[in-house]
From Swiss-Prot:
This is Phosphoribosylformylglycinamidine synthase. Pathway: Purine metabolism; IMP biosynthesis via de novo pathway; 5-amino-1-(5-phospho-D-ribosyl)imidazole from N(2)-formyl-N(1)-(5-phospho-D-ribosyl)glycinamide: step 1/2. PROSITE patterns: GATASE_TYPE_1. CDD domains: GATase1_FGAR_AT, PurL_repeat1, PurL_repeat2. In the N-terminal section; belongs to the FGAMS family. PANTHER family: PHOSPHORIBOSYLFORMYLGLYCINAMIDINE SYNTHASE. Residues 1042-1295 form the Glutamine amidotransferase type-1 domain. HAMAP family: PurL_1. One of its GO terms (molecular function) is phosphoribosylformylglycinamidine synthase activity. Mg(2+) binds at residues 677, 716, 720, 884. Monomer. Phosphoribosylformylglycinamidine synthase involved in the purines biosynthetic pathway. Catalyzes the ATP-dependent conversion of formylglycinamide ribonucleotide (FGAR) and glutamine to yield formylglycinamidine ribonucleotide (FGAM) and glutamate. The lineage of its organism: Bacteria, Pseudomonadati, Pseudomonadota, Gammaproteobacteria, Alteromonadales.
Length: 1295
């Protein structure tokens, strides 16, 4: 083993934060320093030349002053016995650079602690400095040798039930954490006695996973008796009733990893399999939808818990039918009170928590980063979500009890697209090869399915921790590229059957795969790729290593599939074959035995059906006592309640532009305010058709009325999606995610009532189907504190996600009030018809009350009339703005609309009810619309004709003032400056950003939000974007070839190809593996586009690993050097491609003054819609655009331009090689965050070579080349946005 020191691992502000944390724990640390250490395991000695290459590979990241470490060493390494995802990618890069002597490169962090620390204090410090799930701690650098020790495979064990009987299995149930019910223990004992043998631990574990509540949904399939009366249907049958009543437009329901609904016809854009040139295939683009929960892992370890939640849901989408494509995601969280230090709110009580779970604050600081990071690296935009906090001690039928989300809800969902011929899974032929596609087995996530099925507190802490998985999104991207290549083959798709690997690992996925395909399976344990050789057979077969799929492939199609995997560098292994006999046979060549020999009948047979015998209990509630509440105080409290407060800290961490198909993200208007009701994507780059998704949940209402809570969740998802042009209500399909503390008095019957309200009544009446969903039935946390039994129980929680196809994505409305459209009116559609009920409201919550009567959907016909009329008005373009009424009531709705429009509003309450509190803050169903003077009468007539005359009231108008005013009898009852409420609304996000990110950046952004004079984004062009300057050249007929270049982990190649294709290029898909293998030569290309993403997962520096695999590989270096030296070529590098080109500058003439691009100043991934100004430069791409100012998509974590010295920067500027700069909304060069999202000096964000042929930029023009893909744009822009000009300039140059 050789050891190489790396750069400092913590920036100044992160060092300060870490020091504070240690001091708060009472550990006397005076100084702290951390740096990376690289451990290199060698097959044989490195030559001097190879050692030099290795040293250059291990020099990456921002320049930081060198430091001589002092103090006690705490060395944090990847967990001993594992191979980290970082190591596998870094080792790949080393091998691609010709360093074949290297067996493995691992990385650790050496913390040096100065202070008078005892051995015990050092151990306490180590606990805070590492994550025990994925890391180990060493105290001597040489002990890192343990990382490379190979471990001996462990043997099988069995449970002796032949001698020990039922008691032996009952003991194993506890020690293995199987969560088996009593009747399941009886079932197993009976079946193994029939077989006259003892079960192996692996067989019991496999049975427990396959039959866990998590996988089998026993409660949803149970028989029910309520108050002594037998119920006619199971919960699942009531959900299925929605499909039986309205099967319209559903292509697949209840039987696959996701549901499928009918989409529009459009051109699917992808590289054609025969030529690898991109093109359009016009066909129906059907929509798949899925929403998952990952609650238990997120409570234990939020970052990996939420990351693998998103990763698992993405795999569900990709494994639908015989392969499909995930497209856009959503994330949601429900947690207990945040109790932010220094920002504790008057309604927040701190009830305490068990040590084994993290606090709500830590979940919200870490969990969203995990979910966002997975989506970002995979390349899926996260476009909507929700965030609720609830923790309150209430009077209920059980006496005083605390209700809340100590066991959080972590929602991960999304939509994708699938070909019509691929919706149904095929047959598995006998002899089909059974393949694992994806990463290796690792000893993680054991028992995830069973652990998720227990109330928190029933299992041991070690088992809880073992049940969390860890993520490697770049691996999942590689697998998805293979699946994409398969479905793009159309009728030649080699996939016969596919499932993702989730709960229970292969022990669940492989039996499910073969049994669904009507077959059994014979497997070889030692063929499973395995990064931890010391695992037992149980651990190899049952671990929940992520990023894996199981696939059945006919033998004659295997070679083609293997070639696709090799091109994408996606790991795969053939581990078995399908058999006629319906058994699972697992052989272990190492120990010459068979750990599993079970019929599918026993494994998936008919364990006893559950029966629930429960009683109805519903809290009556008491009237709210708010006589002393001041309206201004109530407004401020509500704006600080996380469910209502600004959520920028949850949004800008997530890429919202990747794919180039995003038509509506969360950020609205020129001021980029996060208030959108709905997420919208385009079907393709050649279409205005699309897809929409929106969420709804009103969980606190369930404490007073289970049915109302469920109806309101459905209704809210519909009032949200109504902002998009859906048309027919029957076109909308719902995912229902049910969470409940099963067994808690009253909750089971309440769940039944809620499912019945939605499945048997509301959805059939609306003509809406619920073809997909998920349940999580163990939402209670129990522990002991100072000898006292404590518990926090979640309300029965239904989270609904509505999906629909969109007729015209240009018609989507936002909450932004328009003050540039002449005289206009604000109109409230009040579906509560003046009842103004406040039970379970946000207002009640912020005063620590519950109330009595909740809002409800009382009249289905009225609701349908509202939806249909609003849709008609959306389609006809008669409305200027739309925002539904939800948490915080009318006050919040109007305030958010004014924030989005950066304007004022004047609202009269006279016709809305007599009680100001109830009128302002009730959360009855409804919406506020803005209507121009000329459309006003037509709009009012449309609602009246629909029978909604008594619901529709003109309430006021937007104003140009910095004031939001609510009046009664023309007297102000509640009034403040918009800036005041905008600032209060931003406080929660500001405090969270300060805790999590660079506090200096958080403060700069907060100050910007307090400015009343912010003019917002602008567009000021020096050219006509509607002019197609490439048209004369396209007419000549011969298209120049552009290599759309990608490396493993790149995810922005489709949109790059689409932009070049539109400009008249022949866009060719080129993987780095094609160049290294000699399949493709850059000699044949006139242009090259290095695309964005996370090549090698940004290991060894963003874009640096990719560049170095070119610099230190003879064939690749030769190809690129020759390409850049030709004077008839052009090259563009965007984001990751920009980082890559800047590291390749020794091969690119005229780039010696280019900077490197390193970690953002905020030290956070930044997804923004930022203003830039095109500079006078030599760039051929930006040639005639100089002086133009316009917004552009930004999505990166390492975009800060770092120059070797000030002279380098001034030389670049003097040579006119700076091509783009960030500017602020006042048109000045941006130095402050977030107008300058990464901290680059003088806003520099694009550079060009001396001759202008090579341009590298961090922002993403290829994602916004269509006007509809811009988060905001001036009304007058046509189909092409101004950024399309770049690509046409390139086409014109090449002639």
């Amino acid at each position: 083993m050789e050891i190489y020191r790396g750069a400092p691992a913590l920036s100044a502000f992160k060092t300060t934060k870490q020091l504070e944390q240690l001091k708060q724990a009472g550990i006397p640390v005076k100084e702290l320093y951390a740096e990376y250490q690289h451990f290199v395991d060698l097959h044989n000695e490195l030559s001097d030349e190879h050692r030099s290459v290795l040293v250059q590979l291990l020099k990456y990241g921002p320049e930081m002053p060198a430091h001589e470490p002092q103090g006690a060493l705490v060395l944090v390494t990847p967990r001993i016995g594992t191979i980290s995802p970082w190591a596998s990618k870094a080792t790949d890069i080393a091998h691609n650079c010709g360093l074949k002597s290297i067996h493995r490169v691992e990385r650790g962090v050496a913390f040096y602690l100065q202070g008078d620390l005892s051995a015990e204090e050092l151990k306490q410090a180590a606990l805070l400095l590492h994550d025990r799930m994925t890391e180990s701690v060493l105290y001597d650098m040489n002990d890192a040798q343990q990382l490379f020790r190979s471990q001996e495979p462990q043997p099988l064990s069995s449970v002796d039930i032949l001698a020990g009987g039922r008691e032996a299995l009952a003991q194993a149930n506890i020690s293995l954490g199987l969560a088996l019910a009593d009747d399941e223990i009886d079932y197993l004992v009976e079946n193994f006695r029939k077989l006259d043998r003892n079960p192996n631990d692996i067989e019991l574990y496999m049975f427990a996973q396959a039959n866990s509540e998590h996988c089998r949904h026993k409660i949803f399939n149970a028989d029910w008796t309520i108050d002594g009366a037998e119920q006619p249907k199971s919960l699942f049958k009531m959900i299925k009733n929605t499909f039986e009543t309205t099967p319209d437009y559903v292509l697949s329901a209840y039987k696959d990893n996701a549901a499928v609904m009918e989409g529009h016809e459009a051109g699917r854009f992808y590289p054609q399999p025969d030529s690898m040139s991109y093109g359009y295939s016009h066909e129906p683009v059907h929509i798949l939808m899925k929403v998952e929960t990952h609650n238990h892992p997120t409570a234990i370890s939020p970052y990996p818990g939420a990351a693998t939640g998103s990763g698992g849901e993405i795999r569900d989408e990709g494994a639908t039918g015989v392969g499909s494509k995930p497209k856009a995601g959503l994330v949601g969280f429900s947690v207990s009170n945040l109790n932010i230090p220094g920002f504790k709110q008057p309604w927040e009580e701190n009830y305490g928590k068990p040590a084994r779970i993290v606090s709500a604050l830590d979940i919200m600081l870490e969990g969203p980063l995990g979910g966002a990071a997975f989506n970002n690296e995979f390349g899926r935009p996260a476009l909507t979500g929700y965030f609720r906090t609830y923790e309150q001690t209430v009077d209920s039928h059980n006496g005083r009890e605390t209700r809340g989300y100590h066991k959080p809800i972590m929602i991960a969902g999304g939509l994708g697209n699938i070909r019509e011929a691929h919706v149904q899974k095929g047959d598995i032929p006998v002899g089909a090869k059974l393949v694992v596609l994806g990463g290796p087995a690792m000893n993680i996530g054991l028992g995830g399915g069973a652990a998720s099925s227990m109330a928190s507190g029933e299992s041991t802490e070690d088992l809880d921790f073992a049940s969390v998985q860890r993520e490697n999104p770049e691996m999942e991207r590689r697998c998805q590229e293979v699946i994409d290549r398969c479905w793009q083959l159309g009728a030649d798709n080699p996939i016969a059957f596919i499932h993702d690997v989730g709960a229970g690992g292969l022990s669940n996925a492989m039996p499910e795969l073969v049994s669904d395909g009507g077959r059994g399976g014979r497997f070889e344990l030692r063929e499973i790729p395995n990064d931890e050789p010391g695992m037992t057979p149980l651990e190899i077969w049952c671990n929940e290593s992520q990023e894996r799929y199981v696939i059945a492939i006919a033998p004659e199609n295997l070679a083609r599939f293997e070639a696709l995997c090799e091109r994408e560098r996606a790991e795969y292994a053939v581990i078995g074959e399908a058999t006629e006999e319906l058994t699972i046979l697992l052989n272990d060549a190492k120990f010459s035995n068979q750990p599993i020999d079970l019929s599918l009948d026993v494994l998936l047979g008919k364990p006893p059906k559950m029966h629930r015998d429960v009683a109805r209990l519903q809290t009556e509630g008491t009237p709210l006592h708010l006589e002393a509440a001041d309206l201004n105080d109530a407004a401020d409290r509500l704006l600080r309640l996380p469910a209502i407060a600004e959520k920028t800290f949850l949004i800008t961490i997530g890429d919202r532009s990747v794919t180039g198909l995003v038509a509506r993200d969360q950020m609205v208007g020129p001021w980029q305010i996060p208030v959108a009701d709905v997420a919208v994507t385009a079907s393709s780059y050649d279409s205005y058709h699309g897809e929409a998704m929106a969420m709804g949940e009103r969980t606190p209402l369930a404490l007073l009325n289970f049915g109302a809570s469920a109806r309101m969740a459905v209704a809210e998802s519909l009032t949200n999606i109504a902002a998009a042009d859906i048309g027919d209500l029957k076109r909308i399909k719902l995912s229902a995610n049910w969470m409940c503390a099963a067994g808690h008095p009253g909750e089971d019957a309440g769940l039944y009532e809620a499912v019945k309200a939605v499945g048997e009544e509301l959805c059939p009446e609306l003509g809406i189907t619920i073809p997909v969903g998920k349940d999580s039935m163990s939402m209670k946390t129990q522990w002991q504190q100072d000898g006292e039994d404590k518990a926090v129980t979640a309300p029965m929680s239904l989270v609904i996600t509505a999906f629909g196809r969109v007729n015209d994505i240009r018609s989507t409305l936002t909450p932004q009030l328009r003050t540039d459209k002449g005289q206009s009116h604000l109109v409230l559609i009040d579906l509560g018809k003046g009842q103004n009920r406040l039970g379970g409201s946000a207002l009640a919550q912020v005063y620590q009350q519950l109330g009595q009567h909740t809002p409800d959907l009382d009249d289905t016909e009225t609701f349908k009339a509202f939806f249909n009329t609003t849709q008609q008005l959306v389609t006809e373009g008669r409305l200027l703005a739309y925002h539904d009424r939800s948490d915080g009531g009318l006050f919040t709705t109007v305030a958010e609309m004014a924030f989005a429009g950066n304007c004022g509003a004047k609202v009269a309450l006279d016709e809305l009810g007599e009680d100001n509190l109830a009128t302002l803050f009730n959360e009855e169903l409804g919406a506020v619309i803005q209507v121009s003077d000329e459309q006003y009468q037509k709009v009012m007539d449309a609602y009246k004709t629909a029978g909604l005359g008594d619901c529709v009231k003109r309430i006021g108008e937007p104003t140009h003032e910095d004031a939001i005013v609510f009046t009664r009898d023309e007297q102000n009852v509640l009034a403040q400056s918009r800036t005041h409420w905008r600032t209060v609304w931003a406080e929660t996000t500001h405090h969270m950003q300060r805790l999590r990110d660079n506090p200096v950046c958080a403060d700069e952004e907060f100050r910007l939000k307090q400015r009343a004079d912010n003019p917002g984004l602008l567009a000021d062009l020096t050219f006509d974007p509607s002019e197609d300057i490439a048209a004369p050249y396209i007419a000549k007929g011969v298209a120049p070839k552009v290599a759309i270049l990608r490396e493993q982990g790149v995810n922005s190649h489709y949109e790059m190809a689409a932009a070049f294709d539109r400009a008249g290029f022949e866009a060719v898909d080129v993987h780095m593996s094609d160049i290294l293998a000699g399949r493709v030569s850059l000699e044949d290309m006139q242009a090259l586009a290095a695309c964005g993403g996370f090549s090698y997962g940004d290991v060894l520096g963003a874009g640096e690993g990719w560049a170095k695999s070119i610099l230190f590989n003879d064939r690749a270096r030769e190809q690129f050097e020759a390409f850049f030296k030709r004077n008839d070529t052009l090259a563009l590098g965007v984001c990751n491609g920009c980082q890559m080109l800047s590291t390749l500058k020794q091969l690119i003439p005229g780039t010696e003054h280019w900077p490197r691009f390193v970690t953002n100043r905020s030290e956070r991934f930044e997804a923004r819609f930022s203003l830039v100004e095109v500079q006078e430069s030599k760039s051929i791409f930006l040639g005639d655009m100089a002086g133009s100012r316009m917004p552009i998509a930004v999505s990166h974590g390492e975009g800060r331009a770092e120059f070797a010295n000030p002279q380098q920067q001034s030389q670049l500027e003097q040579n006119s090689q700076v091509a783009l700069r960030y500017i602020d909304n006042w048109g000045e060069v941006a130095e402050q965050y977030p107008a300058n999202p990464n901290g680059s000096p003088k806003g520099i964000t694009a550079v060009t070579s001396d001759d202008g042929r090579v341009t590298a930029m961090m922002p993403h023009p290829e994602r916004v080349f269509r006007t509809v893909a811009n988060s905001w744009h001036p009304d007058e822009w046509g189909e092409d946005s101004p950024w399309m000009r770049m690509f046409r300039n390139a086409r014109k140059h090449l002639g």
